[in-house]
Design a protein with these regions (language model features):
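N-terminal secretory signal peptides
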Residues: 1-14, 26-29
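N-terminal export signals
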Residues: 20-38
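Structured, non-membrane catalytic/scaffold regions adjacent to prosthetic-group chemistry
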Residues: 15-18, 36-255
Length: 255
């Protein structure tokens, strides 16, 4: 009889615990649903970093502040030997690479603070000291490749073309010639010594699908910021428009 009482007591304990666990599970499920509904129905950030609910954008902004505070403009990304670079560089994204593009008429347009616009040919850019960088190119989708690029340091380019006042601004913006793709980049990142205006890949001229005649290579950022086929560059103290930030991605996208 005593053994039966013990068994009944144990069974009641298990039943009570199961009931409590069941209630907690459904409370958590309900709380998760309410949180999802709150996020889903929250207003969108309709600024230049739109395309995402405001609470999520605020979270990304906090991440951006942390990454910016930790960023050291003079710290170099790890580089590799040229023999480690892949021969077949992955092509990812063709927005802004208009097939009707006429390379023979292309000139880089640099819009200065005073309203003047510089128009610079590829041959003129190639007269500046050449810099090569071999690094682990990282895509925000999760893949990476060791790649080899050649061109002109952005900081050298800025000095050569008298952009001292522009370099005091907080951001640089870049567009493709057809203005279909565009990025905004914080000035410390674009002045980092490994950031180049790139005209070579694996020791040869850029292919069309990699942004010929000139693209941006910025090793401290994910691939979405490495704009292919630069048409124009401008400067601002406000965040420039950014294609993927407008579609819900992080604006800073550094790593």
């Amino acid at each position: 009889m005593k053994e039966k009482i013990v068994d009944d007591t144990t069974a009641k304990k298990y039943t009570r615990r199961s009931l409590i666990a069941f209630v907690i599970f459904f409370l958590l499920l309900f709380a998760g649903y309410k949180a999802w509904r709150w996020l889903y129905t929250s207003p969108l950030d309709n600024g230049i970093r739109g395309g995402i609910q405001l609470p999520l954008r605020k979270g990304l902004n906090v991440n951006e502040s942390i990454f910016q505070s930790l960023f050291n403009q003079n710290k170099l990304i790890k580089e590799y030997d040229k023999k480690d670079a892949v021969k077949k560089v992955r092509v990812n994204g063709g927005i802004g690479l208009d097939t009707a593009f006429d390379a023979t008429t292309w000139k880089l347009q640099v819009i200065k603070n005073n309203g003047d616009t510089l128009r610079i040919s590829l041959d003129e850019i190639k007269q500046l000291p050449k810099t090569e960088v071999v690094f682990n190119f990282k895509c925000i989708e999760g893949w990476s490749q060791i790649t080899w690029w050649g061109g002109v340091r952005f900081s050298d380019f800025a000095k050569r073309y008298g952009l001292a006042s522009e370099m005091q601004m907080l951001y640089a913006g870049m567009n493709t010639p057809d203005e279909e793709y565009y990025v905004g980049i914080d000035m410390p990142s674009i002045l980092q010594p490994q950031t180049i205006l790139c005209y070579e890949m694996n020791g040869k001229p850029l292919p069309m699908n990699q942004g010929y005649p000139l693209r941006l290579i910025i090793p401290v950022k994910y691939g979405v910021k490495h704009l292919k086929r630069i048409g124009s560059i401008y400067f601002s103290n406000q965040k420039p428009a950014d294609y993927w930030a407008e579609r819900g991605y992080d604006y800073y996208t550094g790593h």
